[in-house]
Amino acid sequence: MKEYVSPAPDAPSVVLYGRTAARMDEVVRLVRDLGGVSAYGAFTEEELFARIATVPRLRVVLFGGGIDAASRARARAHLAAHAPDVTVSEPGFGYPYSDANIAADLRARLAAAPPSGPTPPR
């Protein structure tokens, strides 16, 4: 599973930026199980940047462990320029890596972050 769209009409969204399909599936399911949250996966920078531009109510981008430092830096720069209200979760870097810690960090970020997403057309 690469994506889960919550049936809740105002569900916040998380973009998962990773390299491994099996782990992406596990983390999408973890986000789904938080309840009332949508999850969208991205395997490449291009896909990540497209998700940042189009995902509704984007609140958090989660970097997987396989994302190298240079790609993380480019992603952070893109977020700063295009979605400055979106926060970054970095399991294994910002906090100890475990599903329980990922869920706890996402819950905290989703509770604290303002809604964000693509700018509506004018």
Predicted regions located by residue number:
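N-terminal, charge-rich interaction modules
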Residues: 1-13, 82
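Conserved acidic segment of CheY-like receiver
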Residues: 11-21, 61
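Short, charged/polar "capping" segments at the starts of alpha-helices
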Residues: 22-26, 70-71
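Short hydrophobic/Thr-rich beta-strand motif most characteristic of the beta2 strand and flanking loop
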Residues: 37-44
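Short alpha-helical segment
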Residues: 47-49
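Conserved phosphotransfer microenvironments
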Residues: 63-79
